[in-house]
Amino acid sequence: MKRQRGVVLLLALVLSLLLGLLAASALRDALVETRMAGHLRDGLKALEQAEATLLAGEAQLQTAPPGLCQACLAPAHPHDLQGQWQASAEGFFQLQNLGISTRALHMPRGDLVTLYRVTAVSRQPESRQVLESIYAIPAAQTQAPQRILWRQRLRQD
């Protein structure tokens, strides 16, 4: 009889250990999912901030367009905010005048338009998002700027 009690005790301890390991594994999975959801939320918030900053840059473009730039390369490392950036409520943006073109996308061929690049960066440093748009403004300036190109820049770009 004593021997059976020892086996039952051992079996109960093994089952308790297995249940404890199962609970620890479930807790770890729940923590990982919580972290993933937090990162996703932060990324979406940063994307919203970058979109709002892009609109702020477009508004600045309508009121005070920049002069023609000499070296119109896109910012090399926009995630690091190196160079001249203008602050807005949701992030930072940079305006560049790319020059005049007669062959802008989605515009009547032959119409003179001035092309501008707006690069927008969200304020969140951990989940920073960078958006870049090219706008065309007709030479007659009777229309608002028209977005002709858009891209999201990743950290690897």
Please tell me what each predicted stretch does.
Residues 2-157:
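Terminal alpha-helical segments
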